[in-house]
Amino acid sequence: MLSKQDLNQISQRGITPEMVQHQLKQIKEGFPFLKIEAAASIGNGIFAPNKEECQKYVDDWTKYSGEGHKVVKFVPASGAASRMFKNLFAFLTADYDVPTTDFEKEFFDNIKKFAFKHELCNKCKENDDACVCDLKKEGKYKEVVANLLETKGLNYGQLPKGLLLFHNYEDGPRTPMEEHLVEAALYASSNGEANIHFTVSHDHLDLFKKKVGEKAAYYEKKYNIHFNVSFSEQKPSTDTIAANTDNTPFRNEDGTLLFRPGGHGALIENLNEIDADVVFIKNIDNVVPDRIKDITVLYKKVIAGILVDAQKKAFDYLRLLDTGVYSHEQIEEIIRFVQQNLGNRKHDIKELEDAELVIYLKNKLNRPMRVCGVVKNVGEPGGGPFLCYNADGTVSPQILESSQIDKNNEEYVKMFKDGTHFNPVDLVCATKDYKGNRFHLPDFVDRSTGFISSKSKNGRELKALELPGLWNGTMSDWNTIFVEVPIETFNPVKTVNDLLREQHQ
């Protein structure tokens, strides 16, 4: 099935033939749906701290970050902005020349409100000897869009989201990359330093480095901080093979195998190389201007405080279990912590012998830990917090995407639809064990939680294998705590017109 040429191509990517055969088998057989106990809710898997508790956790975080621990802000930023402009690309090829759809009208009616307006105007003058207003008056709407999206203009159709101008300020507009630098200074710093790591695509790496080089010093001075900015790319070894509809390997026109990026779950390899005590994770496009950053900063400190508080308890319990000297009451206390604080429940725990119980508790405590902010469901697309069964029969908190739900199971579909909260990708993670060693994060992935999607290339249908999502199956075997955070902390930009929302103005 695989030729000598195929094997060479496979090894050049850092993949083994066995991995390719396993992926083809997964594409053919699909993935099992997860067994779900319930959608998480407040009091059943989601912790909603009150004002006093929030202050306590902020204080815990302030104390922890002042003790010299290494904190890193990890930002997945490889996404191209092309999807943001899908509607405008459609306008460019439409058989009409004036804004017709509601989206097109909203864009042009409010074009002066965008942070990129001055740069766009300059490009229009350079290419068409007219400003945006004049081109609109002349009915040359498509020229305006071309100057925004195409290489002759600002090239926003090809740039990464992280480098587009999002927000207006008196001292000039800011990109999401800059907003993340500011956030790092405000909640993810320690000892006068802020470490921030962007995962970027190979094509955009130099652009990011250039922009950071231009901007970092300004924010260092403004916030009296030193930034350590690093970058990594998604590894080719995490790409997955594409298949034809009959499950045979899909081949390019030159006969080579087609490999595709395996989705954001591949970033576990990048995260695994981060040496830090605490890692904040948030998507590149979920940023707001300074005037409403306070609530984001507050709740980042809250969830970080909850993390370091829970981690300290877990470490203390592990050290106690290591001594071999503990009382029945202490074991009961550890069981309560594992079941109530970490949400790991084993229905037949009382049937375990003493030695088995200690092994079980050690196993459940000694793993990476994450606190996930979740927001009230307002109909935004995305995954949600659930309580799910694991292979060992235990139940634990998991973030599920709709693709992981069995659509033929009416009860599960109802749980997903009626879920009170959803996942805005607001995580803070602890990736070291109680002896100070880094966990090997790929060991904690549930490999049975990927999914198959239908795509096409050059008009030919294909099956694509998506790895378990970074905050889904890839962190399946982590200890997970869900915490309710305000909806105001979630302001993603999925289309260019989202920048017109009040939060981004």
Residue ranges and their predicted role:
Residues 1-34:
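Polybasic, low-complexity association/targeting segments
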